[in-house]
Amino acid sequence: MTDEIPWGPTGELVYNRTYARTKPDGSKETWPETVERVVDGNLALVDRRHMLEGEREDLVRLMTKFKVLPAGRHLWASGVKNAQHLFNCWVAGWPEKISDHFQFTFMRLMEGGGVGANYSNHYLEGYPEVVNPLRVEIVCDPEHVDYQAMKDVGILSEHYSHDWAGAYAIEDSREGWAAALVDLIDTHYRPGTVHYQRVYDVSRIRPQGAKLKTFGGVASGPLPFAVMLQKVANIFSEYAGITLDGIAAMEVDHAIAQCVVAGGVRRSARMSMMHWDDYQIDKFINIKASTGEHWTTNISVEVDDEFWRLAKEGYGSFAVAREDMPKQKRAHRVLKALSEGAVRNGEPGMWDSSLSNVGEPNRVVCTNPCGEITLEPWEPCNLGHINLAAFVTPAGKTDYLDLIRAHRLMTRFLIRATFSEVADPKSREVLDRNRRIGVGHLGVASYLALTGSRYSEAPGDKRFTQFLREMAAEVDSEAERFAHDLRIPVPVKKRTIAPTGTVAKMPGVSEGIHPIFSRYFIRRVRFNLNSDMAELRRLAAEGYEIEKDLFAPNTEVVSIPTKDTLVQAVEELGWDEEIVESADELTLHQLLAFQALYQMCWADNAVSFTANVHPDAYEAEDVAADLKRFAGLIKGSTIFPESSFPQAPYERITKQQYESAAAKAVEDGVDEECANGACPIK
C-alpha cells in the first residue's frame, strides 16, 4: 500500500511523526486508515441526508492521493471519539473580566492550538486597577517524583507545607491548571484580600515524562507550571495600584506560552499585535531585542487607512492637516521600523485592519498566528487546502473537472466542521454566527512550473488570474448551496492562503503560494526531545548534523542538505530547471505582486505569505517604497531576510556544495515556523 501513496521525499516521515494515531492494538495508523477516519468523522458531523451521492468515496480518493488536504488538526483529531478538537488557532479577546482572556489563551495553547491577541491599550483601558501585590508559594508532597527537582531549583516554599489545609490544590487537568491561573489573577483584583501569600499545592500534577493521550506528547511535570504562576504574580504585582497595560498583558501571555511549550509535542504558536498609534508601539516593536524574551510569539503592527494616508505623504505636505502632523511623524517612524525590521530579522510584520474589515459583519481584531485568517474575538480558523500540483496531467494540462470537484468538496468539508464541539461558549456563539471557513491552495509554485509557467509572470497572466476567479466562484457557490441546505448562515468569508508547512511536506509540493526558497539549501528541522528521540537517533546515525535549539527548550535542530523536489520533477520532464524560479531570483516587488494577485483574485480572508529576501539586496527605504506601493492590496506582510539569525530555518547553498555533501534530496524550501512561511500547529 505504501508504494501506491504519492509520498513526498519526507512525507511518510512527517505523517508518522505528526498525524498517525495509535490504534487499540498499539500499532500506528496507515495513511488510508487516517483518511477514512478523517472523512467519516467529518461526514458524521451533520445528518447523512445532506451528503452528496458518492461524496465519501470522492473525498477518500482525493485525500488519499493528496489532492485535497484539510488542515493538520483535522488529520489528527477528526473521527476521534470524545476528542474532535478540529480547530487550529483562535483569537483571544478582552472580555469584562480580564482573567477570562488569560484562561482562554492557556486552554487553547494546552490543546495544541495557536492564539492571536491584539494588545493595543484601547482594549485594556477599561479594566480596573490591580489591587493586590501577591507572592506565590509552591508546595508539594515530598513523595512526588519531581519533588527533588523542584527543591533543587528553589521553587518550593520555605514557609508553607503541603499539609497546610489553606493551600489551593491544583487538579491534574487542563481545566485544573487554568482554574488555578484564574484564581491567582482574580485574587490580584479582589478587594479585601488579607493574606498576600497565595499558596498552591502541585502534588496532584503528574510527573515529568508521563504520556498525554488526548493531544499527544508527554507531561512537563509541575515545575514549568509553578514557574509560570510565580512569573504571572510578579507581573501583576508590579502593577498594583495601576491598570495593566498592553505590554504587561503580552508578558503574561508569554509566561503562559513558556509553560505550555515546556512539555508536549508542539511548540506554542502566538500572534501579538498593537496599533501603530498606541503610546507603547515603540516598546512593542523592539520588545524581542530589548528583552531577549517573547520567542513564543510573532509580532505584527496593526496599520489602517489613516496610517497609509499619513505615511505616503512627505513631511510638510499640504495634504496633511496641522493637527495630524504628530500622528504623521509617528506613522513615518513606524514605517521606518517596519522596513528596518524586515531587512534585519523579519519582524515586526504588518497587518492592515481597515482592508481586513471590508466585508466583515462585525469587527475583526487580529489574525491567527500565521496570518491567513482575520478573526473576531474567540473565533477559530477552519482550514483546508487544494493541492493544485496534483491536478496536473502527465501532459502538463489541468484536470479541471476533478479540480472543480475538489474545491466544492473541501468547501463542504469545512462547513461541516463548523458543527464540531468547541470548549468555550463564546467561541460557539461566534462560530454559529459566522461559519467562517478557509479553503486554500498549496503547491502553487509547483503547479505553475509543471504547466510550463514562470512564477514571476503569473500576476500578468490573464489565464491564471481568470483561473483563480473561476475557482473562487466555485467555492462561493457551493458554500451558499450547502449553507442553505443546512439552514445555517452562509460563511462570512470562505477563501484563504495558509502556509501549509507540514501538510505540504506529505505530497512534497511547494508550500502555500510560496516560491521555492532555493534550488539547493540546508533545511533545519526542529524535533522535540521528549517525543521525537527515536527519530533524532536515526538521523544522527545517518550522519546529519544535530545541535541544541538556541531559542526553544527541549528541542534539537537537524540540518539537512537538500535539493528541491520541484527542480527534480522539472528535470524529469526534460525541461530546463530554470523554469523553476526560486525566491533569490525574484525581487521583493515580484513577490509582493504575487501575494497581491492571490489577495485580489482568490482570498476574501487573508493571504499568509513570507517574502524571503537577501538582506544585502535591500535597504529599509526599498522595503518602505514597496510596502507603500502595495498598501490597500495586501492585508498583511512578512518580509524575512535569509540567515538573519543563528539556526535559521533554511540556508542557501550552491549546487556544488549540495553535491559534495552527497545528501539525499528530501524536501522543498520553506521550514515549519509560522514567521518564516509555515505553521507548527497540527
From Swiss-Prot:
Pfam families given in the database record: Ribonuc_red_lgC, RNR-II_ins_dom, RNR_Alpha
SUPFAM superfamilies: PFL-like glycyl radical enzymes
Alphabetized InterPro entries for the sequence: RdRp_reductase_class-2 (IPR050862), RNR-II_ins_dom (IPR054158), RNR_alpha_hel (IPR040763), RNR_lg_C (IPR000788), RTP_Rdtase_AdoCbl-dep (IPR013345)
Domain of life of the native organism: Viruses
Annotated keywords: Cobalamin, Cobalt, Disulfide bond, DNA replication, Oxidoreductase, Redox-active center
Catalytic activity: a 2'-deoxyribonucleoside 5'-triphosphate + [thioredoxin]-disulfide + H2O = a ribonucleoside 5'-triphosphate + [thioredoxin]-dithiol
Record EC number: 1.17.4.2
Similarity remark: Belongs to the class II ribonucleoside-triphosphate reductase family.
PANTHER family: RIBONUCLEOSIDE-DIPHOSPHATE REDUCTASE, VITAMIN B12-DEPENDENT RIBONUCLEOTIDE REDUCTASE
Protein name: Putative adenosylcobalamin-dependent ribonucleoside-triphosphate reductase
Organism name: Mycobacterium phage L5
